[in-house]
Regions:
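FIC/Doc superfamily catalytic core
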Residues: 1-372
Length: 372
C-alpha cells in the first residue's frame, strides 16, 4: 500500500465536512465559555493560569515523544520569556528550548507562517542536540526518513516520509496552503478542520530530521489561535498524551490514505476534550480565589504554607490526599501542633477529612463556581 504522499492526488485530502460541522460548532461555543471564564480570574492569577497551561503543554508535547522535562525549569523559563518575575532556578537547555517555542507560538499566533517561522521553532527546540546534522533547516540527508519500531534486525516501518530532495517543494506548497486557509484569506477553513489537516499534512511531509511531532502540534495550536482570534490556551498536548497510543495509531492509519474524515473526527473530539480540561483548570483558579476569600485571614503561617503547597499540586491536590506526615514534612512542626492545625482547618471548612488513624487523609474543600 502506498504512503499518502505517493498517491497521485496528494495533497488533496478528502473528508465529509457534514460530520465535522457539529464539532466545529461545539468548539466555537466552548471557546466563548473559556474566554468568559478567564475574565473571572484575577490578573495575577491569570498570569499563573497561563504559566500552568503553557508548562503543561510544554511538558506533555515532550512526553508524547518520550522526553521527560523538569517542570520547575520549564515554568521558570516561561516566566522569563514572558517578562514576568521569576526565581533563580536554572533553565536547562531542553526546558528552555521548548518554553521559548511555546511562548513564540502563543505570542505570535497571528503572524503568517513562513519557512523562517518553522526554522526558528526547530532551532529553539533542538539547538542543544549535537547529534543532528540539520538544525533550523529542513533535512538534507539522502537516507530514507522512516518512523520505525522494534529490534534493529527486524524493524517495523510505520511510515516513510518523502525523500529530502522533495522537501522544499512540499513545504512551499504546505506553507501556501496553511496561509490561504486562515480565517481572513482566500480559502478559509473551519477551525478544527484546518488544525487537524495542518497536523496530519505536516507530519506526513516530516520535513525535519527530528522534532516533527512537537512542531506539528505547535502548528495545530497556531491554527486554532488564528481561527478564534486570540492566543490558544487549549490543553491539546496534555489531552493527546492521555491517549498517546491511539494518537499514533490514528496518524499511522491516515498516512496511507487521503480520506481523512475519521482522523478529523478523532482530532476534533480530542480538541473538545482539551477545552474541557482548560475549563476545569480555569474553574480551579476561580475556586482557589474564593477559598482564600473565605479562609486567608484565619490561616496561621504553617497552615498557609501547607494550603499553598496543596494548591501548587493543581486540581487533583496531593495524590491520595494530604496526610499528617505530609503536614509535618512541610511545616517541620511538632506532631501535637500539626494535629491541632489540621483539626482547626477541618472545623473551619477549609479541609475535609476521610479515613481513620494512620489512614486519615485531608482534602481541600473547594466551592464549585457558577460564574460565567
Amino acid at each position: 500500500m502506498p504512503w499518502n504522499w505517493q498517491i497521485p492526488e496528494w495533497p488533496e485530502f478528502r473528508y465529509d465536512a457534514s460530520k465535522i460541522a457539529p464539532l466545529e460548532e461545539k468548539f466555537l461555543l466552548s471557546s466563548g465559555e473559556i474566554l468568559g471564564a478567564v475574565l473571572h480570574v484575577s490578573p495575577s492569577e491569570r498570569e499563573q493560569l497561563r504559566i500552568d497551561l503553557l508548562s503543561d503543554e510544554a511538558m506533555k508535547t515532550s512526553a508524547i515523544e518520550g522526553e521527560m522535562l523538569d517542570r520547575r525549569s520549564v515554568q521558570s523559563s516561561l516566566r522569563r520569556q514572558l517578562g514576568l518575575s521569576t526565581d533563580i532556578y536554572p533553565a536547562m537547555p531542553r526546558e528552555h528550548g521548548v518554553a521559548e517555542m511555546m511562548v513564540d507560538v502563543y505570542s505570535n499566533y497571528a503572524e503568517v507562517l513562513t519557512d523562517e517561522t518553522l526554522f526558528r521553532w526547530h532551532s529553539m527546540l533542538l539547538s542543544h542536540d549535537r547529534n543532528l546534522e540539520s538544525i533550523g533547516t529542513y533535512r538534507r540527508h539522502e537516507d530514507a526518513m522512516q518512523i520505525v519500531s522494534g529490534s534493529y534486525d527486524r524493524p517495523t516501518v510505520h511510515f516513510e516520509a518523502p525523500p529530502s530532495v522533495r522537501i522544499q517543494g512540499e513545504m512551499d506548497r504546505f506553507v501556501d496552503w496553511f496561509n490561504k486557509s486562515s480565517p481572513d484569506s482566500e480559502h478559509p477553513l473551519p477551525a478544527l478542520t484546518r488544525a487537524g489537516l495542518s497536523h496530519l499534512y505536516f507530519e506526513s511531509i516530516h520535513p525535519f530530521e527530528d522534532g516533527n511531532g512537537r512542531l506539528s502540534r505547535a502548528l495545530a495550536e497556531k491554527s486554532l489561535a488564528q481561527n478564534i482570534g486570540q492566543p490558544s490556551l487549549i490543553a491539546l498536548a496534555f489531552t493527546i498524551e492521555w491517549e498517546r497510543k491511539l494518537y499514533y495509531d490514528q496518524l499511522e492509519r491516515h498516512q496511507k490514505t487521503l480520506d481523512v474524515t475519521t482522523w478529523l473526527e478523532w482530532f476534533a473530539e480530542t480538541v473538545l476534550s482539551a477545552q474541557q480540561v482548560t475549563l476545569e483548570r480555569v474553574g480551579f483558579f476561580i475556586a482557589k480565589a474564593h477559598f482564600y476569600d473565605r479562609h486567608r485571614a484565619q490561616l496561621n503561617d504553617r497552615q498557609a504554607k501547607v494550603i499553598e503547597r496543596i494548591f501548587r499540586e493543581g486540581p487533583d491536590g496531593f495524590k491520595g490526599g494530604l496526610s499528617a506526615e505530609n503536614y509535618l514534612a512541610i511545616t517541620r512542626t511538632s506532631r501535637a501542633t500539626a494535629t491541632r492545625d489540621l483539626q482547626e482547618l477541618v472545623e473551619r471548612g477549609a479541609l475535609s477529612r476521610t479515613g481513620e488513624r494512620r489512614y486519615t487523609r485531608y482534602w481541600l474543600k473547594l466551592e464549585q463556581s457558577s460564574d460565567g
